[in-house]
């Protein structure tokens, strides 16, 4: 338990183009070394590609793909009497979103397309269609939690 006062959660402003907080958060996660304008151009370019390929609203597709990546359960290490158990726990709603965004960006960087816009657009489309590396990561995390279900009583 923290001994200091609880740190207030900072309010995030919506992005200028879509006026959406999810897009603004994703820009902040995508940003490297404080270069926000570059992160914005990458994400907006990727969302333009997504809008062209799906003939649908880009933000709606992005939110659906993030929903397909969000994990419901994860495992946490818990030490009990000299041995460490992987204990399955539910993921808090804010952590679900942040994990989904991190996985989306991580697995889009590993793709083979040429530019980051194309990589990110490809991963968003794959997640929208419930396939791709980020969705596989979620499935692996769920499998791990299901395999360690016997240790669920060590939850704290």
Swiss-Prot record:
<dbReference type="InterPro" id="IPR023798">
    <property type="entry name" value="Ribosomal_uS7_dom"/>
</dbReference>
<protein>
    <recommendedName>
        <fullName>Small ribosomal subunit protein uS7</fullName>
    </recommendedName>
</protein>
<keyword id="KW-0699">rRNA-binding</keyword>
<dbReference type="GO" id="GO:0019843">
    <property type="term" value="F:rRNA binding"/>
</dbReference>
<dbReference type="Pfam" id="PF00177">
    <property type="entry name" value="Ribosomal_S7"/>
</dbReference>
<comment type="subunit">
    <text>Part of the 30S ribosomal subunit. Contacts proteins S9 and S11.</text>
</comment>
<dbReference type="GO" id="GO:0003735">
    <property type="term" value="F:structural constituent of ribosome"/>
</dbReference>
<keyword id="KW-0687">Ribonucleoprotein</keyword>
<dbReference type="GO" id="GO:0006412">
    <property type="term" value="P:translation"/>
</dbReference>
<comment type="similarity">
    <text>Belongs to the universal ribosomal protein uS7 family.</text>
</comment>
<dbReference type="InterPro" id="IPR020606">
    <property type="entry name" value="Ribosomal_uS7_CS"/>
</dbReference>
<keyword id="KW-0694">RNA-binding</keyword>
<dbReference type="InterPro" id="IPR005717">
    <property type="entry name" value="Ribosomal_uS7_bac/org-type"/>
</dbReference>
<keyword id="KW-0689">Ribosomal protein</keyword>
<dbReference type="InterPro" id="IPR036823">
    <property type="entry name" value="Ribosomal_uS7_dom_sf"/>
</dbReference>
<dbReference type="InterPro" id="IPR000235">
    <property type="entry name" value="Ribosomal_uS7"/>
</dbReference>
<dbReference type="GO" id="GO:0015935">
    <property type="term" value="C:small ribosomal subunit"/>
</dbReference>
<dbReference type="GO" id="GO:0000049">
    <property type="term" value="F:tRNA binding"/>
</dbReference>
<comment type="function">
    <text>One of the primary rRNA binding proteins, it binds directly to 16S rRNA where it nucleates assembly of the head domain of the 30S subunit. Is located at the subunit interface close to the decoding center, probably blocks exit of the E-site tRNA.</text>
</comment>
<keyword id="KW-0820">tRNA-binding</keyword>
